[in-house]
From Swiss-Prot:
Lineage top rank: taxon: Bacteria
EC number(s) recorded for this UniProt protein: 6.2.1.22
Keywords per UniProt: ATP-binding, Ligase, Nucleotide-binding
Designated name of the protein: [Citrate [pro-3S]-lyase] ligase
Source species: Leuconostoc mesenteroides subsp. cremoris
Keyword Transmembrane: no
Cross-referenced Gene3D superfamilies: HUPs
UniProt catalytic activity: holo-[citrate lyase ACP] + acetate + ATP = acetyl-[citrate lyase ACP] + AMP + diphosphate
One Pfam match: Citrate_ly_lig
GO molecular function, one term: ATP binding
Function comment: Acetylation of prosthetic group (2-(5''-phosphoribosyl)-3'-dephosphocoenzyme-A) of the gamma subunit of citrate lyase.
Length: 338
């Protein structure tokens, strides 16, 4: 059966059957006619791949393709995988341009991402509405935890714009939980009357959430994820909220963040101006303020370090919850990363 499957795909121009591609497959479905495969598709994590339909069935070509894609998408939805990608191949390169194109956002020459703009519209509608304003800035942060550096970045945006949206990433992969991070950001900017702090939801996406094990290089993972993030932000979120600029912090120590910032600049400018703000230095000889350094200090119980890097409100939270935070680390919570 596997040999027949591979032979069918090879006849459709798909020839990569390395173990690294096959081993992650969760499910493969096939459509038969007269005991011969006429269509197939597979799923690996969040990626739909190995999709092909027999060219000789052109009369039912679009119907069969859409049936396959619907079955695969439904399977992923049942599994809770709503951020769905399709890996382009010799077949899908042709078909996705003509069929179901309204459902898919082109990321690059290798990947498409499934659109669900109704969910995205619902997300935007939950944000506080404002009357039309000329200068609306945006800041996207993880705030793990909220530092003086984050505060400095938001202050810059606040001084130079009439309104600032601060999107806090919604991913439970951090030492500080999402509700804690949002609360810390709100407490840290409560004196800035033109700043609105919101949960970024599912569509303000960190590149860390991308299934990088499907990609060959880390730089590629950053590029793919940032492209999705930026294009959704530019064409759907920013347009809905009237956002005219985005503020990001420079990262002299992080190759990945530098790549991320470069992608933002190339994709957003000139319609949405990207401001790269130089990182704020900590007091003493600690160098640039870094949330990672704060997390490492929490792990070591080094209060002198985190006090120089975080706001007073964040200091109080860490002091009151130090044992709980350290316990999370002892249980395996990773503290590296951005």
């Amino acid at each position: 059966m596997r040999r027949d499957w591979q032979n069918f795909l090879m006849a459709c121009g798909i020839k990569n059957f390395d173990d690294s591609e096959l081993n992650p497959l969760d499910i493969t479905i096939a459509v038969y006619e007269n005991e011969e495969i006429i269509g197939t598709g597979s799923i690996a994590g969040d990626v739909i791949k190995y999709v092909a339909v027999q060219e000789t069935t052109m009369s039912g070509h679009s119907t069969l393709f859409n049936q396959l894609m619907t079955k695969l998408e439904n399977f992923m939805a049942v599994e809770g995988r709503f951020h769905q990608f399709v890996l382009r191949n010799q077949f899908t390169k042709k078909v996705l341009n003509t069929l179901a194109s309204k459902r898919w956002l082109s990321v690059n020459k290798e990947f498409c991402w499934k659109k669900d703009y109704q969910i995205l519209r619902n997300t935007c509608q939950q944000f506080p509405s404002q009357t039309p304003i000329d200068k609306v800035a945006s800041v996207v942060i993880n705030a793990n935890p909220f530092t003086n550096g984050h505060r400095f970045l938001i202050e810059e945006a606040s001084r130079n714009n009439e309104l600032v949206y601060v999107f806090v990433l919604n991913q439970e992969a951090s030492l500080f939980h999402t509700d804690e991070r949002i609360a810390l950001v709100k407490a840290g900017v409560q004196d800035l009357s033109n700043v609105i702090v919101v949960n970024g939801g599912a569509y303000i996406i960190s590149y860390l959430t991308f299934p990088a094990y499907f990609l060959k290089h880390n730089d590629s993972a950053i590029d793919y994820q940032t492209t999705i993030d930026v294009r959704l932000f530019k064409y759907k979120i920013a347009s809905a909220l009237g956002i005219t600029s985005r503020y990001v912090g420079s990262e002299p120590l992080s190759h990945t963040t530098n790549l991320y910032n470069q992608k933002l600049i190339s994709e957003l400018n000139p319609q949405i101006e990207v401001h790269v703000i130089q990182r704020k230095l900590a007091a003493g000889d600690l160098g640039v303020i870094s949330a990672r350094t704060v997390r490492e200090a929490i792990d070591k119980g080094d209060e002198a370090v985190w006090q120089k890097m975080v706001t007073e409100t964040t200091q109080h939270f860490i002091s009151n919850n130090l044992l709980e935070l350290q316990q999370r680390i002892r249980k395996g919570q990773k503290i590296n990363g951005n």
